[in-house]
Amino acid sequence: MSETPQTPEPAREDALPEGARHVARLLAGMGHDQPIVLLPSTGKTSAEAAAGLGCDVAQIAKSILFRRAADDTPVLVIASGVNRVDEKKVAAQVGDLARADARFVKEKTGYSIGGVSPIGHVVSPLTLIDEDLLKLSSLWAAAGHPHAVFNLTPTQLVAMTGAPVVDVALRD
């Protein structure tokens, strides 16, 4: 039986990659006192991030970017790590969707896939928050780099993004 890993130590700001430093400055400006943590390995998937943090996969607030088909507006869905996003539900909220490739993600958010933070984008996206995240007391979100994350509550996530909370999960 393996031990649950302990949460990695907070990173010094000067040790953070540029995208994570950007997020750290934004969080500080918002009065958010939780430090950014660097994962020992990538957090590109919810399972990898949860394993590195020793938390439940559901606590990973994953950021998935889509492109609104009508006008190329970025659409950010922040979903629980255990949920698959139901694109039909998202489209019902914002209009028809198209896939966002890595170039679009980087251009619109300033971050690479796997490190998209819920805040601090180059172009402000339309954002939706998975209602399942509000059932949890603590979340971890990407902090601008695939190895960087920060801890927050669902209430803080809603306040930081100003996004509506909706049902976006694909249900059986």
Can you describe what each PLM-predicted range is?
Residues 2-172:
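Extended, low-hydrophobicity, polar/charged segments
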